[in-house]
Amino acid sequence: MSAAIAALAASYGSGSGSESDSDSEGSRCPLPAADSLMHLTKSPSAKLSLTVAVDSAPEVAVKEDLETGVHLDPAVKEVQYNPTYETMFAPEFGPENPFRTQQMAAPRNMLSGYAEPAHINDFMFEQQRRTFATYGYALDPSLDNHQVSAKYIGSVEEAEKNQGLTVFETGQKKTEKRKKFKENDASNIDGFLGPWAKYVDEKDVAKPSEEEQKELDEITAKRQKKGKQEEEKPGEEKTILHVKEMYDYQGRSYLHIPQDVGVNLRSSVPPEKCYLPKKQIHVWSGHTKGVSAVRLFPLSGHLLLSCSMDCKIKLWEVYGDRRCLRTFIGHSKAVRDICFNTAGTQFLSAAYDRYLKLWDTETGQCISRFTNRKVPYCVKFNPDEDKQNLFVAGMSDKKIVQWDIRSGEIVQEYDRHLGAVNTIVFVDENRRFVSTSDDKSLRVWEWDIPVDFKYIAEPSMHSMPAVTLSPNGKWLACQSMDNQILIFGAQNRFRLNKKKIFKGHMVAGYACQVDFSPDMSYVISGDGNGKLNIWDWKTTKLYSRFKAHDKVCIGAVWHPHETSKVITCGWDGLIKLWD
């Protein structure tokens, strides 16, 4: 286009070379008007302007902006796109659960952990199992034997020797016959052995003479004497009074129920309304090891008895200065359980030194001791007034033994359990008692009849090492080892109440005590993480949970006359009062 314009301009220029030519030759074509060529010339006023804007902070696509909405929900099982490795294994977003324990934090798809689906051929599994039982080796199941050369576990040398043969293969190696000395020449009368020849690897054992036998008998007798364990003698019982005077100015001991504490401790009527405890108001410290159990004084609850793994039993004040009144010393091993009689004047203690001891609460004197050479796990007085001389103890040899304090002898044995007996609770106006055991069963007994008339054992049941009777006597709260509290009826049929199951705490492996509030509105229990859990009785909802002890919170007792006072004990050696 530009070349055509240039040629046109040149043709116009050649025609206007001189004025004479233009004048002489009038017949030439006239010049075009200037307006007609305006579109071919460059306008001097038109200028090309380039505007450049300088921005010191340009917009940049941030990586976080691009990744919004890409976070995966850890609960989702299927993903509709292909996420990156970083996206799939990024840490979880959102607030952290403050009550999440170490067991709960681990990924799992079932209650006890994470189970991966796997398929094992029954024949191949049985083949390897029998091979291992017969020859002592089997293929390593953790390796893919199709891709890796076969590796064995167990006796690898035997596997190489047999070339990996299994019990189902016909070419297995036959055991070598034992070789005998050969001398089959019958003409050799003195040296002929025949079928009576000895084996090559046979060893001759000479019978000791009479003198040697006597020496051997003496040596074995000495060894037996050394090996015999000396029978554990009961430890020397003593008591320490920690207050200056045992009696006040009126001659009353600390067993006297106080009347100036703001609560009627002699009343048999429970408080109308109970409330949740919220703060710690006192700590009793005196035990050097974990506290096993705490028991309140019968009816009034103005005294507290505690037993510990430091082999000591201590009596504390609940009101006033809350002092330690007396220490009872007499067991050589950890004390497992304690129990007051109905009046509170005496109490029993059961310890791992295989002794049950009867103590006087006021003087601290050890009245008598009982043992059948087995470890007692629990002990209970018969609550009836006319049977205060009888008590029962659950033993480690699967028996419940009944003793008479007056004679010191065993008067009855209940031996139907298949495991160590953990708890004994009297029900139905003390005519019957309920026992639980390591055999995961619950049995109900008539008093003094050694045959259980009710046996409860479901396949889904776990061991229940702590059982408590409700204040109204209608329900049994059982601490089950599958982290829940089960409620059984305690009057007629002893049925499981499936509407009342309390969950949310971690007690697997610990016999944490359960208790009720006096008005039956709350259920309390410690747990393995040292927390105190409080549930609502009607709705089974977990109302409150707070840290009570640094170690396992093994015991929790609600004061029978207070609206919100709870006493807890733990394996940190402390006893705490909450209100």
UniProtKB/Swiss-Prot annotation:
PROSITE patterns: WD_REPEATS_1, WD_REPEATS_2, WD_REPEATS_REGION. One of its GO terms (biological process) is embryonic brain development. SUPFAM superfamilies: WD40 repeat-like (SSF50978). Residues 1-19 have a biased composition (Low complexity). Gene3D superfamilies: YVTN repeat-like/Quinoprotein amine dehydrogenase. WD repeats lie at residues 286-326, 330-369, 371-413, 416-455, 459-498, 504-545, 548-578. Undergoes isomerization of the peptide bond between Gly-94 and Pro-95. The reaction is catalyzed by PPIL1. SMART domains: WD40. InterPro entries: PRPF17, WD40/YVTN_repeat-like_dom_sf, WD40_repeat_CS, WD40_repeat_dom_sf, WD40_rpt. The keyword Nucleus applies. Disulfide bonds: none annotated. Residues 1-34, 204-237 are annotated as: Disordered. CDD domains: WD40 (cd00200). GO terms for cellular component: nuclear speck; U2-type catalytic step 2 spliceosome. Its main location: nucleus. Keywords: mRNA processing, mRNA splicing, Nucleus, Repeat, Spliceosome, WD repeat. PANTHER family: PRE-MRNA-PROCESSING FACTOR 17. Component of the catalytic spliceosome C complexes. Component of the postcatalytic spliceosome P complex. Interacts with PPIL1; this interaction leads to CDC40 isomerization. This is Pre-mRNA-processing factor 17. It comes from Mus musculus (Mouse).
